[in-house]
Amino acid sequence: MAKKLEITLTRSLIGRPSDQRVTVNTLGLRKLHQTVVQEDNAAIRGMVNKVKHLITVNEIDA
């Protein structure tokens, strides 16, 4: 089975630099406490690492 990441936006984007806002939007997160499921690959991991202070991440088998 392929691994996937369950990503939830837990902190607000107010006052954050524009590159962090763009990264969160690229992950598919628009609203606070919204959760999305993304493939576990190097590109997604890089984006998660960039905004790890704003999100929570869980690995799931899907």
Swiss-Prot record:
GO CC aspect terms: cytosolic large ribosomal subunit
In which domain of life is the source organism classified? Answer: Bacteria
Q: Which UniProt keywords apply?
A: Ribonucleoprotein, Ribosomal protein
InterPro entries in UniProt: Ribo_uL30_ferredoxin-like_sf, Ribosomal_uL30_bac-type, Ribosomal_uL30_CS, Ribosomal_uL30_ferredoxin-like
Question: Pfam families, per this entry?
Answer: Ribosomal_L30
A GO term, aspect molecular function = structural constituent of ribosome
GO BP terms in the entry: translation
Ribosomal protein keyword on record: yes
Task: Say which family it is in.
Answer: Belongs to the universal ribosomal protein uL30 family.
Oligomeric state and partners? Answer: Part of the 50S ribosomal subunit.
Q: Which PANTHER family match?
A: LARGE RIBOSOMAL SUBUNIT PROTEIN UL30M (PTHR15892:SF2), MITOCHONDRIAL RIBOSOMAL PROTEIN L30 (PTHR15892)
Q: Which NCBIfam families match?
A: rpmD_bact
Protein name listed in UniProt: Large ribosomal subunit protein uL30
Source organism: Shouchella clausii (strain KSM-K16)
From the broadest rank down, the organism's phylogenetic lineage runs: Bacteria, Bacillati, Bacillota, Bacilli, Bacillales
